[in-house]
Structures are given as C-alpha cells and as structure tokens.
Amino acid sequence: MKRVLVTGANGFIGRQCLPLLLARGYEVHAVSRQDVDQSSPGVVWHNCNLLESESRAHLVTQVKPEYLLHLAWYAVPGKFWESPENTEWVRASLDLFRTFEKVGGKRLVAAGTCAEYVGNAGECHEEKTPLLPSTLYGSSKHALERELHSCSKRGGLSYAWGRVFHLYGAHEDPARLVAYAVRSLLRGEQAVCSNGLQLLDLLHVVDVASAFVRLLESDVTEAVNIGSGNPVVVREVLNEIGRQIGQPQLIRLGAKPSAPNTTRLWANTVKLAKEVGWAPHYDLAGGIKQTIEWWRTIGDPKGSRTPGSEPGIDCR
C-alpha cells in the first residue's frame, strides 16, 4: 500500500484531500498541531508542530512515507501576508523535504500560491508570467519553490508545486469573502462589500483538493497552476450568492472603499488539464450552491467573523 504523509491535514484544503487519498488506496498519515477528531476511518493522525525540528524529524523517520503532500503554512486571514512566520515555514519546510528524501521518499507535492506572480498579471502562465511577489508570503513561497527545484536537480527527488489561486467552500474561514457573504445573508444581514470589480479565478476547495491528489499521482514536475482557468468578476459571485439565498438586496456593493488598483489575476490551466489530466467537478453556480448548503446544515451562520478582520478573498 502506498504511504502518504499529509501536512496541514486539518486545514481548508487538507481535510478535503484525506477522503480522496483513502479512496485511491493510500495509507494516509495526517499531521496537525491542533487536537482533531481522530475517528476518521483509515486515517492515522499525528499531533506535531512542524516548526520544531526534533518533532519534525521524529515524525518523518517514524512514518517513512513514500509520498508527501505539504499543505501546512501560516494562513490566518489578513495576517499571513507579512507575518514573520512565513520565513520560519521556509526553513521548516526545507528541512522536512530533506528528511523526507533521506528516508526514501519518492514524490513530493507542495502548495504554492498565485501571490508568487507579479500583481495584476491577468492570465498567469507557469513559464511565461513574471514571478515578482509583492508580499512576504508570496516571496517566501517562491523562495521555497526555488530551493526545492535546486534540491530535486541535485538529488533526483520528484516534485511538483501547485500554485493555488482563489478558493472557497466548506470550512472556509468566516473572514474570507464568500463565507462572509453567505453567512451574512443566511442571518438576514447585509453583506457590506467593495465595488466587486476584481477579476479573479475562483475554484471550489473540493476541486482544489482533487487537483492536488491528481498532481501527486502524476509524474508532472515543477510548478502547476491550480485554478479554474475561468476569470469571474467578484460582483457576479456576490450576486449569485444573493440570488441563490433569495436575498439579493442584502448584497451592498460599493458600500466600503475599494482598492485603488482593481485586481486582475487568473490561472492558465493548460498544464493542469492536459499534462496532469484534471478537470473540475463544480462550476461556479454549483460550487456556490454546495457552499450555501454546507453553511445551512453544518456551519454556524449565527457566529461572528474573526475579531478585527475584514472580509476578503485570499490566494492560498
């Protein structure tokens, strides 16, 4: 049986990867530094702080995975862009990768970000669009990918780097835009938004997870964009939420200040579709429907968002 170690396994993307990996016959070892429900059939949970070198080394040498899906990072909405923890995660991740290779690891896939690209690039192509990150988060992810690239050339480790664009869906942080809008309308409250003219690439988190699993199983190497490939104006997303919930009048476009430069950023997904062989399950309307249903039945629409945070859509 193929053995995989998944970091960030209790996170937004990671939790969606676990059932997909189990369905494909993997022995799944999941890492979290938080207490989690360990009753997931077939998943072996490990409580580990990956920023601690001894704990990290012990985990990898104990599990001896053939595959590594590295999704863990500091990702508190609104804070992760310039957090010093970004540089800590670069160092910890590199050490994790080296230990993985030493114990006989064969294939490594890690999560990158669309924030590695130059801002407002429009359509982003893995080999053509300039990589000029403007945040510490984007710079740290890019630096890690460059180091991983060098390591793979020296040692022969097979790796791929999934550059995640904008995502939404079940278990989304309430401070992010789609979750904020859905929860506000389900409470019968206004969703106070900017003008919504941003042109972005939105992909349901289940599809993001399936893309990562498919990438892990492929022999495709280096950077691969993970997105829908279909840019959408944010106000159309918000209006779709209002339409499906039946409260379109509660979407308050232009009620809060907009950024001076309207963001335009989406993925070229030719490599993902043709080389990796992946296609999304959800279109936008279907993904929004599933998200609304999740918040209605499982989520907590009456809860409040993270104190001091403002709603927004973040690159992973």
Where are the regions that the model predicts?
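Short alpha-helical oligomerization interface
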Residues: P77-A92, H125-P133
